[in-house]
Regions:
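Hydrophobic transmembrane alpha-helix bundles
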Residues: 150-163, 214-223, 241-248, 281-301
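C-terminal, helix-dominated tail/subdomain
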Residues: 211-237, 256-266
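Acidic, carboxylate-rich catalytic segments that either coordinate divalent cations
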Residues: 261-317
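Short helix/loop segments within enzyme catalytic domains
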Residues: 117-118, 244-247, 254
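All-alpha helical catalytic cores of prenyl diphosphate-utilizing isoprenoid enzymes
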Residues: 1-207, 272-275, 282, 286
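Hydrophobic alpha-helix feature that most strongly marks membrane-spanning transmembrane helices
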Residues: 169, 173, 192-195, 201, ...
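Acidic carboxylate-rich catalytic motifs and surrounding loops in phosphoryl-/glycosyl-chemistry enzymes
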Residues: 124, 250-257
Length: 317
């Protein structure tokens, strides 16, 4: 029988983590001089990478349940006077307790046992906890028409890819390499752009489900008319940093990474398809992820969700 503090993952979490693991192997192994097309390169490190990502997905699912429960019950996680049914309240309380009481402790213990835990990995896991806290705070604020700070929004979007950084740091530890800070810096900028791209692709769904989404946050902060231009400015600044960092990479590595981005685009990966050229004065994006398109913003999210619910009800009848 497993101990209470033993890290364990479910099959569903492993299945959900699959696409992230594939993307990580295809996009990050090259930074370690490894060929993802050679099975021995993948399977040597896959158990630790798969277990870690699956555990993170498992915790992320619990956090999503809290956010979605807040949406469906029109309640705020931290400060709600509304009463839930007794059984539901107990379950909700347990989920909150798990996320508030060092959710990564079992994983940390497991990695320590394997001799893989470093202070840098521990720090990234703490960033993951911080992201989930910010996600709950910001989504609750949107739902309850409360003010949000743009500093919190930008902090959250930069923390969001913490799992990729954890996996990358684990790979450094397993291969015995010294962490390459130049590569980490380049990848952090690329991760930011991919997260923004994902948010633009998932915008309408994130409004419906009350998920963290940078465009939603910009609409609340700057208003529906100004949000697209402000986000376009943010993307342009990140693209400029990306281009400068790309020039610092080894030419062969730079070529391989850009080729990987092109492959992902052809495969229809939503992370690699976006565009804000109309908001950049007609400028074509220089980022290898392609050009950008910001979807029409939803000024009144509550009305949007209500109308969608009415439409689905009419379809049923």
């Amino acid at each position: 029988m497993p101990c209470a503090d033993m890290a364990a993952v479910g099959l569903d979490s492993m299945q959900r983590a699959n696409s992230t693991l594939e993307d990580f192997c295809r996009s990050y192994f090259m930074f370690h001089g490894m060929d993802v097309n050679k099975p021995q390169s993948v399977f040597k490190f896959l158990p630790v990478l798969a277990f870690t990502e699956s555990y993170i997905y498992q915790m992320d699912t619990l956090n999503e349940k809290i956010v979605h429960m807040s949406t469906s019950n029109d309640m705020v996680m931290e400060n709600s006077d509304r009463e839930l049914p007794e059984g539901e309240e107990r379950w909700f309380g347990k989920v909150v307790d798990v996320l508030k009481s060092d959710p990564f402790n079992p994983l940390v213990r497991q990695l320590e046992t394997c001799g893989l835990m470093t202070e840098r990995i521990r720090k990234e896991l703490k960033f993951g906890e911080e992201y989930w806290t910010l996600e709950r705070k910001l989504c609750s604020a949107l739902l309850n028409q409360k003010q949000i700070l743009i500093e919190d929004v930008m902090r959250a979007i930069h923390l969001k890819s913490f799992d990729y950084r954890v996996l990358n740091l684990l790979l450094y530890e397993m291969t015995g390499e010294k962490v390459n800070d130049l590569h980490m810096e380049f990848l952090s900028i690329s991760e930011f752009l991919v997260e923004v791209s994902d948010d633009l692709f998932d915008y309408e769904d994130d409004v419906i489900e009350n998920n963290f989404n940078i465009l939603r946050m910009f609409v609340r902060t700057y208003g529906a008319s100004e949000a697209p231009a402000m986000l376009a400015k943010c993307i342009a600044e990140a693209e400029e940093k990306y281009a400068k960092q790309l020039e610092l990479l080894d030419s062969d590595l730079s070529f391989k990474y850009q080729k990987r981005c092109e492959e992902a685009t052809k495969e229809g990966n939503p992370s690699i398809v976006s565009s804000v050229s109309q908001n950049l004065g007609g400028k074509v994006s220089g980022h290898s992820l392609g050009s950008w398109t910001i979807p029409p913003v939803i000024a009144d999210e509550e009305l949007y969700r209500r109308n969608l619910k009415k439409s689905s009800t009419r379809v049923l009848f």
